[in-house]
Amino acid sequence: MPKREIEDTQSPYSSTGLVSTGESPKTSTSTPTSSTNNRAATTTTNNTSTTSTSLLKSNSNLQPIAMTPSVSSTSLAINKPKSQENKRRRVTRACDTCRQKKVKCDGKQPCIHCTVYSYKCSYDQPNIRNKKNSGIPIPSQPSPAILQVAAQAAVAFGSNNNSSNQQSLQSLQQQQQHVVHQHQHQPLPADEPIPKTNLIIFQQIINALLPKLQLNGFDPNLQFDLNKFQKVVQYVMSKSQTFTLNLNEITELMQDPDSQIPPPPPASSSSSHHRRTLSVGSFDDSSNSAVSSPREVGLHLPSKEVALNLIYTTWNKACVLFRFYHRPSLLEEVDLLYSLDPMNYGDRQQKFLPFLYSILACGSLFSKTPYTMGTPSENEKNLEDDGFKYFLEARKLIDISNVGDINSIQTVVMMIIYLQCSARLSTCYSYIGIALRSALKEGLHRNLTLFQNSKKKLDPIEEDTRKRLFYTIYKMDIYINSLLGLPRSLNEDEFDQLLPVELDDENVTRTEYLFDKQQGRLSSSGCANQHTKLMFILSHIIKKMYPIKVKPEEAENSSNVNYSRDRIHAKVTELEVELKNWLDNLPQELKPIDPSSTTKDVIDEVPEKFRLANYYLHLAFLNCQIILYRPFIHFISDSMDGSSSDPRSLIRGRNCIKVARMVVKLANKMIDHKLLLGTYWFSMYTIFFSIACLIYYFHFANYNNNGQGFNYAGILFDDDLNIDMIKKDIEIGKKVLDNLKNSSNSSLRIYNILNTMFEQLNRRTASRSRQVTATTNSTTTTANTNSNSNSNSQPTTLPANFQNVNVKNTFENFDNMNHFVKKERERERESLSQLFDNTSMAKFESSSEIPKNVANIQRVATPLEENNKEIGEVSGGNLTSNYMPGVFDKLDTQIFGKILPPYMLEKNETMNYNSNNNNSNNVNNNFNNNNNAGEVNNNSNGVAYNNNAANWPLNNAEDGLNLEDLFGTLGNNGNGGTSSSNGLEYLDPF
């Protein structure tokens, strides 16, 4: 045998049968070889012929099939183990790069060779060897005699499907075997008609599925109503819920000439529409593979009309403030995709498909009917199932570990939007990290105008898409890090990318930016840019208010209480200035409107096109304020004496409660106008955190004082901290969550957690009230009498420390930021410098006394426990590295899984236990700070006291509220009230 033939015979790809040359294998050799090789070749030939004969005999009772000369060469491969078959499977088409370099290709997208060497992997070039059918090998041409015999057998089987004709079938099969042996090497006659192989396959399928119809596909005068058959199949499919066909019903309807086929019912979801199906296998269909190939999936696209509806839903609801793609270009790709046959999809369509599927997933999720109180309808369940199915298809079509182009990064971002309301935040955090690293790898963080030359320059659409995509990922990273308490992934001084151009998508073309057509109108990209600027301010708030490490120069002066107080309040004032400047620069269409206003004129001031963006921006703005003022909430909610606190801290604690109330009112207003979506994460977590603030304040500020409330700043706060008003707002917030709980899994988790808080706090409060009622009634009466006598005898005056200019400005800063009356621009600029005057902040020292007549009532209740000791309880509240966490910090940690910064954690000094004291009510841990560490004594009542805290008990044994029990319940540890876990164990984040 020549050397070339030996190589072909021994090639691992020659016996697979995928590529056949049409020549039968040779059984003799022309070159001298060893006797062993001759015997092996003879044995192989005999085995091949024997196997072929046995296969033909064993198939005598089966349906006749079209026999080809390649059967004898492939029969051995059928009986081989599956592992060998997978190893010998040959890829039918290599990528363009591998074909050019003449290297092996695994047929994947991208292939392993292009992945290793960072080549561009594409399948665009046509197949030179076979231009008619690129990528699909041509089988050897069968003999016409074989096809004729197979056709006769198929017709006989279809018309005589009973046991009486088995002899005729056997005779036909024997005739077929004889013809195969006789005509195996004969050339094809030119004038003999050849039956089509597809027609034979069609006849066999019809005979197997619908034998009663007795169709003869070889009859040139066949009378078959194809339109009626299609209507019958559609009608039967519409009646089935599982896509199973009743073949008997199809046969009966086709045989009945008078049958009336009713039209199929209208489709209720995208799952009922016509689907375009394509199997894009990687040609490595090994079932033993642990990870399936990225291309080994079944693509199920809905009809074009349904797809466009889902795309518009994603654009108008899910991506209101996230414009990271060019919509006209997207619609062009969709039109091109649906105009092509799935078998003709090229590299461009293969890269676009994952992005399209992710958009369809988000569109299905946001298409659910809002505010469904009962069990979701069947249509709602179908939408959710379709969304999950599209998400899985998108995830399978991309290699998440090797995201290397714009379409893939956009796919990951859209998957994040889908996951934020259906998975936990920790999952979103991982995907955001992948998207950000991929964007940095592609250079999206750099301003390419500095590097582009005239020969290779990006067009305006590509350039603007890069900007949009980068800033969308960056602000997602900022937001989720603020929720989870994790570090920022990228600093502002590490990128120089410009903000996207504020033009409508239609005015950004391949050639130029059409600024003249925009004419200064607000665009959707402009709304997204305003949200991006706000997220920058949120990043500054996290950096300045929640630092992980205190700078050395600031730590040196941290022992100075007045300096540390002024320093932290100076930072807050700077951040308030940033928020005020952002608010002043907003376009008129995005100016916040008063959530308490019920007049229709105020709402109509905002164009309907930008109404949803206006509300979402307002929620994001209020979220920034909550995070800004959140460290001060302990000053106004605990039972500690307000006289020891800085008035500015009290005011900013009051601001946190005011903002939380404002969020609840705004959410309720959005529900009234059907604009609030529970699937939108920016709104959902802001509402949740606001209600948690109100619940926290309502319980610890109200029940620490026997239901009377305790307003530290008196008349200055008016009704801002009124317990009854806050209780009403909590009920409104609960109603909001009732409406949103069925919108997404995140909404349902939030609803369940807050319900647990309601139940736990109410149960502990009721138990505590029964225990202390007898002892507190007389004390409360005396306190109220003294308070009334003091208020009657002395006029209510403001203390000196509240009359300071900086303290007044602290009030005005917040009120001016949340003042919804439109003022003249000049007046705003003039008042800005006055309101945020901070020149004397470094020298300001507040008085440590607040007269009793300023408070509504005297404090008559004992504080709860050590966990209620918050910042500001000693010497004006040292907001430095000795910041001590309180109840709300632990609540924050439990709910979000947020790890508190070191400066917010207690000093880990373990107290010396008294070996003679076995009282279970004693405190086991001493939460001290270095500057104010006091000794802990145990009295006969089993209550631990801190000597530096005016002998206030750290743990009240008579109090029925056990915070550890509450946190254990939130953590679902299954131990109930006997949980031994501490309050800083973390839940899995959302």
Swiss-Prot record:
PROSITE patterns: ZN2_CY6_FUNGAL_1, ZN2_CY6_FUNGAL_2. Keywords: DNA-binding, Metal-binding, Nucleus, Phosphoprotein, Stress response, Transcription, Transcription regulation, Zinc. Disruption phenotype: Decreased hyphal formation. Residues 24-61, 160-179, 282-293, 773-793 have a biased composition (Low complexity). It comes from the Eukaryota. It holds the Pfam family Zn_clus. It is found in: Nucleus. One of its GO terms (cellular component) is nucleus. Transcription factor necessary to sustain growth on non-fermentative carbon sources such as sodium acetate, acetic acid, or ethanol. Plays a role in hyphal formation. PANTHER family: ACTIVATOR OF STRESS GENES 1-RELATED (PTHR47540:SF1), THIAMINE REPRESSIBLE GENES REGULATORY PROTEIN THI5 (PTHR47540). This is Activator of stress genes protein 1. It comes from Candida albicans (strain SC5314 / ATCC MYA-2876) (Yeast).
